[in-house]
């Protein structure tokens, strides 16, 4: 760099350039000259000609000068003298200061020249040092970036690391370090959910730092500026377009490429997280934040009819919430529920995938806030299903928060019911599916038409049982309470003293404070007590119940609880009855199974067991039976096929078709003796008589497990009555809505106590008599019965809980009434 040396001039040389007068003005002191004239005029001037004394012009006229006193002239002279010397002093000082400043400027200029020389030499050294530092940074970045890849490539060849690994863990298998490192990373990413995000953040920081240092090494910007540019290249891949220089452009492109890779990875992680969240929602892994809902644990073929009944029950409140927890995929459950051909009527069904045996899954569906919990039986055999139900009840008891609702457990074997109640306590209500179906089949076999009555009462479409307290009826006797509800029919009383439910109490029972009334009504908000109507107590026929005649019943198949069905028949049938048992179980094994189940065959008084061995789907085996002589034929679901509903229903359907075909060919040879004895208590045109004479054949009752198959059989009219698991679903739904109803159902299903019966009209009225329904209810009380409905001769279905009970109606002897009566 050229050095510019300023030209130095001395003060003396510069003074030569000044004008002569100026030089003299600075070098010669100005001495004032005083001259006194006649006219007391003083003129003085040092160098200025204007201040010299003027020569008077003889031609000019003298100007008169005013006269002054001597003291004034002396004062004026001293003032002028003082001012003159002050000015001279100031000028001398100024000149001296100027000379001092000029000498100081000269010294500063010399020092400036020296400093410039030194700075030029140091800048050359700094440029060299900066160049060296950028080179060091560049090579450091390359080495530290390449070194990890080289170490990873030759990681397995590091013998000392292998030896160290063998010494520290000699028992483990010698695994390559690459695999071990990959395994450690995999475990870290799997165990710690935020490890991927932290790794991405670390990679971003490393890229920014390495890219910034590399950019600093190949450009002339500072470190802080390079780091900022590196971040902008990572965040925006197009911001490197204005880079100048080959090195800067290469580094910028590399940083931008790394930034695109990082952002692509980040988008992948975000997309993966969102996919997992959506997948969790789709698979039903999220938590259910509901309260006062009904929780269903498990999945079975009864779920469809169960949801239908719950939806109908919740219709009056605008719909409720039903949560289903099962070990199935959530999408599959929702797809199967969508296939059900019924309207949910505002009820929301929420499906969650999980196991009822896991407490975490139970908490996920808000088990503590559910108002009712239904435990469905599995599709396994009865013992496995009951064992699983027992484990579910144990899991429910392990919930620390507890549960405010009651639990309804579907059992398959009646013998396992006490064990579940022992584990769960008083809040457990059990519904034994096999027992319910078996008892209903027997009741329908002995009283044709009762199946439709039970479907109306158990289902929520028509009338069902409700229990409620009515303080305004305290002090009333049950005889008056019976006719106090225009839109309901009282059936019993829940005694406040001991909590027992008394069905069909005596007329003189007086309601006490706290007692609740059991009624049959359309809904819980559709009835209320009113004023007592006027009832006419006129004369009516008093007929005795017809005597029982021996029955001949055939069981096709072997059920699990067939011993309980035999006990019920023993209690209900007249002496001399026969029970034919046709199945594939050997005779000796049958007796052993019945004895092991607790049945003492030798103590059977009313029925006689007749054993026949054969296959119910083989025609020649069925032809060996006197099918035309049986009063009722019950086709039971085979115990050996209880794991497969489809196979069981197919077998029952094949047996039904074969029996009907054989009966049709033997029709001319049918002995009508037993049928004549059986229907002697009813008029010739009675509805019950027509049912008992269905197609002039024996009454055939089929047990069909799948409700869809049941609908097909009902439409084809090849069977008189079809009972399926739909009735069990109705019972589960009713007990879930009110657990007290379970005690009512158990008494009505039992062989002792009160039961549903169908009575002919001649028990209560004369032919063509015109009376209201209240009058008939009062007449039935003379027989200790409660009439809950009727079926007119021209109607297809019975009417339960008629609306206008005070309306006069003309009755016929062909009509029948549905009553609750004490079993004989």
UniProtKB/Swiss-Prot annotation:
The chain crosses the membrane at residues 81-101, 135-155, 198-218, 250-270. It comes from the Eukaryota. Disulfide bonds: none annotated. Residues 291-432, 550-699 form the RCK N-terminal domain. GO terms for biological process: monoatomic ion transmembrane transport. Gene3D superfamilies: NAD(P)-binding Rossmann-like Domain. Residues 325-346 form a coiled coil. It is a multi-pass membrane protein. It is found in: Nucleus membrane. Residues 45-70 are annotated as: Disordered. SUPFAM superfamilies: NAD(P)-binding Rossmann-fold domains. One of its GO terms (cellular component) is nuclear membrane. Its main location: nucleus. Signal peptide: none annotated. Pfam families: Castor_Poll_mid, Slo-like_RCK. Residues 45-54 have a biased composition (Low complexity). Keywords: Coiled coil, Ion channel, Ion transport, Membrane, Nucleus, Transmembrane, Transmembrane helix, Transport. Belongs to the castor/pollux (TC 1.A.1.23) family. The absence of an ortholog of CASTOR may explain the inability of Arabidopsis to form root symbioses with mycorrhizal fungi. PANTHER family: ION CHANNEL POLLUX-RELATED (PTHR31563:SF10). This is Probable ion channel POLLUX. It comes from Arabidopsis thaliana (Mouse-ear cress).
């Amino acid at each position: 760099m050229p050095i510019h040396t300023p030209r130095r001039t001395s003060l003396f040389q510069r003074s030569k350039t000044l004008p002569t007068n100026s030089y003299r003005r600075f070098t010669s002191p100005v001495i004032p000259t005083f001259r006194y004239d006649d006219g007391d005029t003083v003129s003085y001037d040092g160098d200025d000609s204007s201040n010299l004394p003027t020569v008077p012009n003889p031609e000019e006229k003298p100007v008169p000068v005013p006269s002054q006193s001597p003291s004034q002239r002396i004062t004026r002279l001293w003032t002028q003298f003082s001012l003159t010397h002050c000015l001279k002093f100031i000028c001398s000082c100024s000149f001296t200061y100027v000379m001092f400043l000029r000498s100081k400027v000269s010294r500063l200029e010399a020092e400036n020249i020296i400093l410039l020389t030194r700075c030029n030499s140091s800048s050359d050294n700094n440029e060299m040092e900066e160049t060296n530092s950028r080179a060091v940074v560049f090579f450091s970045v390359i080495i530290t970036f390449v070194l990890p890849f080289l170490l990873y490539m030759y990681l397995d060849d590091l013998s000392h690391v292998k030896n160290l690994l063998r010494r520290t863990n000699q028992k483990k298998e010698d695994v390559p370090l690459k695999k071990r490192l990959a395994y450690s990373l995999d475990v870290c990413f799997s165990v710690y959910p935020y490890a991927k995000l932290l790794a991405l953040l670390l990679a971003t920081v490393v890229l920014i730092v390495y890219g910034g240092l590399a950019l600093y090494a190949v450009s002339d910007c500072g470190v802080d500026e390079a780091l900022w540019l590196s971040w902008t290249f990572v965040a925006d891949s197009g911001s490197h377009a204005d880079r100048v220089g080959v090195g800067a452009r290469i580094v910028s492109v590399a940083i931008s490429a790394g930034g695109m890779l990082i952002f692509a990875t980040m988008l992948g992680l975000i997309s993966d997280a969102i996919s997992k969240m959506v997948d969790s929602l789709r698979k039903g892994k999220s938590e259910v934040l509901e309260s006062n809902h009904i929780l269903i644990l498990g999945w079975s073929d009864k779920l469809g009819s169960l949801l239908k009944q719950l939806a109908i029950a919740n219709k009056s409140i605008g719909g409720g919430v039903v949560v289903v927890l099962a070990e199935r995929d959530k999408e599959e459950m929702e797809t199967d529920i969508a296939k059900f051909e019924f309207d949910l009527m505002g009820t929301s069904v929420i499906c969650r995938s999980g196991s009822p045996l896991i407490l975490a899954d139970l908490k996920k569906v808000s088990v503590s806030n559910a108002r009712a919990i239904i435990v469905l039986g599995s599709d396994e055999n009865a013992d496995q299903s009951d064992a699983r139900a027992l484990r579910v009840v144990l899991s429910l008891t392990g919930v620390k928060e507890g549960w405010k609702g009651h639990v309804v457990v579907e059992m398959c074997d009646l013998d396992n019911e006490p064990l579940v109640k022992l584990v769960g306590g008083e809040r457990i209500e059990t519904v034994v599916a096999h027992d319910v179906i078996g008892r209903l089949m027997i009741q329908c076999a002995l009283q044709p038409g009762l199946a439709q009555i039970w479907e109306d009462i158990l289902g929520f479409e028509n009338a069902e049982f409700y229990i409620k307290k009515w303080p305004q009826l305290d002090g009333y006797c049950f005889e008056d309470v019976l006719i106090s509800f225009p839109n309901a029919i009282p059936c019993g009383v829940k005694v406040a003293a001991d909590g027992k439910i008394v069905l069909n109490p005596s007329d003189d029972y007086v309601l006490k404070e706290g007692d609740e009334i059991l009624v049959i009504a359309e809904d819980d908000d559709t009835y209320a007590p009113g004023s007592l109507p006027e009832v006419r107590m006129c004369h009516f026929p008093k007929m005795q119940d017809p005597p029982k005649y021996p029955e001949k019943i055939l069981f096709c198949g072997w059920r699990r609880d067939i011993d309980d069905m035999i006990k019920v028949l023993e209690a209900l049938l007249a002496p001399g009855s026969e029970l034919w048992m046709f199945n594939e179980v050997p005779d000796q094994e049958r007796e052993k199974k019945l004895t092991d189940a607790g049945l003492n065959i030798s103590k059977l008084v009313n029925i006689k067991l007749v054993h026949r061995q054969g296959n119910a789907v083989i025609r020649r085996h069925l032809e060996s039976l006197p099918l035309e002589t049986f009063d009722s034929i019950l086709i039971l679901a085979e115990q050996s096929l209880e794991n497969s509903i489809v196979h069981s229903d197919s077998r029952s359907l094949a047996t039904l078709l074969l029996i009907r075909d054989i009966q049709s060919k033997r029709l001319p040879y049918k002995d009508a003796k037993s049928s004549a004895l059986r229907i002697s208590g009813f008029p010739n045109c009675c509805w019950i008589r027509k049912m008992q004479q269905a197609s002039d054949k024996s009454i055939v009752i089929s047990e069909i497990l799948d409700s869809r198959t049941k609908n097909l059989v009902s439409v084809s009219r090849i069977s008189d009555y079809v009972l399926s698991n739909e009735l069990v679903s109705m019972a589960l739904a009713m007990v879930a809505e009110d657990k007290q109803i379970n005690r009512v159902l158990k008494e009505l299903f039992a062989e002792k106590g009160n039961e549903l019966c169908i009575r002919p009209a001649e028990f209560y009225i004369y032919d063509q008599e015109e009376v209201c329904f209240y009058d008939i209810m009062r007449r039935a009380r003379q027989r200790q019965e409660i009439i809950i409905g009727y079926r007119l001769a021209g109607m297809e279905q019975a009417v339960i809980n008629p609306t206008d009970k005070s309306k006069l109606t003309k009755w016929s002897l062909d009509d029948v009434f549905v009553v609750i009566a004490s079993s004989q």
